[in-house]
């Protein structure tokens, strides 16, 4: 089976996410065709969506201007999986605590932006993530913190604060799972649901 994975390709680690999705698919004997999303009309044909990091205000503006935001909401309402990382999580949230961000409101969380510091304060930490065997090497770069959680399920915490959640078909992380050689977060977000 070949799954079509769409990556919102405004900013962020697009090629790294593509490699992680393809690795996760390959580990299950499947294939993933990766397409970049910069305009409307692509999301409806995707089985999986990735919303990478970058600058949340820039991502939000593109999603609104190109009319991609309603397509992402429809994708989620159809129960199709999404992985939103770092700034992608900020945009996907119910409340980004930033008037410049038009939230998609597909993850019932409130965000505190850049809570883990500036770029120079970046770090890697082993996380126990619900659904994964063994710690995940999470890379935090100017990472947001999930300040409060509504109906979402907390999948991982760092120092007592949520950093990974699942809300229906959406998995959101404060960290960058694509910056490791470990594709288990992509597998957890996508293939456990898409192949079920």
Region locations from a protein language model:
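Glycine-/small-residue-rich active-site loops that bind phosphorylated ligands and cofactors
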Residues: 13, 92, 180
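Redox-cofactor binding/interface segments in oxidoreductases and associated redox assembly factors
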Residues: 50-51, 84, 173
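Cysteine-nucleophile active-site neighborhood
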Residues: 56-128
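A structural micro-motif
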Residues: 3, 30-32, 80, 102, ...
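Short polar/acidic secondary-structure junctions
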Residues: 26, 96-97, 130, 146
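Amide-donor transfer/coupling interface in amidating biosynthetic enzymes
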Residues: 113-196
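N-terminal beta1-alpha1 cap of cysteine-dependent amidohydrolase-like domains
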Residues: 1-65, 71-77, 183, 187, ...
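Cofactor-binding loop segments of dinucleotide-utilizing enzymes, especially the Rossmann-like FAD-
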Residues: 10, 87, 175
